[in-house]
Structures are given as C-alpha cells and as structure tokens.
C-alpha cells in the first residue's frame, strides 16, 4: 500500500500494490496519519508550491472509505455502496471533489458545487414525495395550505444544505488531530478491539474533533459504522461534550 502526493493535482493517492487484509490497510493508514506532519514537511521541501490544503482535504475525504472495511472485517468492495447524495454531502463538507477512483473504491462525485447540491436536493425531493404518498390528505386541505407547505419545505432544505455543507476549516491543529487519530487507530488494530464500545466512542470523539458535527455524521455513515449498537454506551450521552473529551480522550 503506497501513499503518494500527486504533483499535478496536489492530492493524496492511495495505491494498493498487493492484497492486504483490511486490518493491515488500516495499520498502514494509521502510520500515515501518525506521521502526517513529517509527510507534509517532506512534500513542502520537494515542492514549495504544492497546495497542502488541497492535499489535506483529499485525505479527509478518502479516510472513511478506507477505514470502514476494517471494522467489518471485509474488503471495501463487499460493503454496501455509499449513496450518491451522502458522497455529495461529504464532498461539500471536506471541500474536495475527486475526479477518479482509487482502486475498486469509487470516490467520484460531480466536479462543481452546484451539481453536488442538485444531487442532495433531488434526494430531499424524493424523500418528500415519499412522505406525501403516506399523508395524501396534506394535498387536499386547500391550495393556500399546500403552497405554504412547499414554501416552508423549500426554505428548510436550503437552510439545511447551507449549514450542513459548510467546508470543514483547516487550522494548525488539523495535523495534530490527524496524528492523534493515527495513534489511536494503531491501538485499535494492535489490540484487535474494533467492536469495543468504549474505544468506538473514543474513535467518534477523535473524528468529531477533525470533521465537526455535520462532517462527522457523514464520515460515520460512509464508514458504515452508524448501525453499531455497541456505540450507544452511557458515555455516548456525553459524546460531544467537553466533559467526555476531558475524561476519555
């Protein structure tokens, strides 16, 4: 498994030179994260015009696609495909739109923000139409009520897209948090504790600190971790609070 910085596109490329068990892949990925400061420094020394922010955003986008298989002990291609609208959400949140695939993992999303927003809007519209089928009486009260319903729904969708699709900020602490995540992933791999509820909660906190609330939700779903019942521990109630972070991280 090779990690390359693409000079022309300023992005991270992950190349698999031979078959690896999912846990081996995550162990190597953890090594990259653990040494991300040195990796970035080496890139700058070789090419001082390299866009590190683009590189980091490409890394943030690709992480959940490569991590999920380890927790399910199965190659990524055997895990259910990620919905296009979720990829569009995550692309807008990370500020990165991959134009190609990485191995057998399809990372492609439309290049323009407008195209990605339209994917999300179509998803909302489809969900709305399904709900109308269940509650058809909403259509027959009055024209005024239906127009108000559509207007309210449209404003709500635009608000959700605007606030939930804001780009994750990159700051001086981003490299540190990525390194912390790498160190923690190595602990999970070495101990083979991928279904330990306390460690999953700590993993969630690490990811939350990197991606923020909306980005974390997309990350967790893309990695296909949102169905783990063991994540719902007593500590999870305090999951996003400073109390939990202080106690367990």
From Swiss-Prot:
Pfam families in UniProt: Luteo_PO
Organism domain of life: Viruses
Iron recorded as keyword: no
Biological process annotations from GO: symbiont-mediated suppression of host innate immune response; viral process
Domain F-box-like intervals: 63-67
Record keywords, A-Z: Host-virus interaction, Inhibition of host innate immune response by virus, Suppressor of RNA silencing, Viral immunoevasion
Family annotation (InterPro entries): Virus_P0
Function: Suppressor of RNA-mediated gene silencing, also known as post-transcriptional gene silencing (PTGS), a mechanism of plant viral defense that limits the accumulation of viral RNAs. The P0 protein suppresses local PTGS using its F-box-like domain to mediate destabilization and degradation of the AGO1 protein.
Family to which the UniProt record says this protein belongs: Belongs to the polerovirus P0 protein family.
Self-association and partners: Interacts (via F-box-like domain) with host AGO1; this interaction targets AGO1 for degradation, and thereby suppresses the silencing function of the latter. Interacts (via F-box-like domain) with host ASK1 and ASK2 (SKP proteins); these interactions are essential for viral pathogenicity. Part of a SCF P0 complex composed of P0 and the host proteins SKP and CUL1.
Name of the molecule in the record: Suppressor of silencing P0
């Amino acid at each position: 498994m090779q990690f390359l910085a693409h000079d022309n596109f300023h992005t991270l490329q992950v190349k698999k030179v031979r078959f690896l068990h999912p846990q081996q892949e995550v162990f190597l990925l953890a090594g990259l994260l653990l040494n991300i400061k040195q990796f970035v420094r080496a890139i700058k020394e070789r090419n001082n015009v390299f866009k590190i922010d683009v590189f980091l955003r490409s890394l943030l986008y690709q992480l959940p696609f490569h991590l999920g298989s380890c927790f399910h002990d199965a190659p990524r291609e055997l895990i259910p495909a990620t919905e296009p609208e979720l990829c569009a959400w995550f692309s807008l949140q990370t500020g990165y739109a991959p134009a190609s695939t990485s191995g057998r993992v399809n990372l492609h999303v439309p290049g323009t923000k407008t195209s990605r927003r339209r994917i999300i809007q179509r998803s909302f519209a489809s969900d709305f139409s399904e709900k109308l089928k269940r509650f058809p009486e909403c259509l027959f009260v009055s024209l005024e009520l239906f127009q108000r319903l559509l207007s309210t729904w449209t404003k709500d969708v635009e608000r959700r897209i605007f606030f939930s699709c804001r780009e994750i900020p990159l700051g001086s602490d981003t490299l540190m948090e990525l390194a912390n995540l790498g160190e923690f992933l190595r602990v999970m791999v070495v101990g083979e504790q991928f279904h330990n509820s306390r460690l999953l909660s700590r993993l969630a906190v690490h990811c939350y600190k990197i991606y923020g609330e909306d980005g974390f939700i997309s990350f967790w779903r893309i990695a296909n971790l949102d169905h783990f019942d063991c994540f719902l521990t007593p500590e999870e109630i305090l999951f996003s609070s400073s109390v939990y972070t202080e106690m367990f991280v």
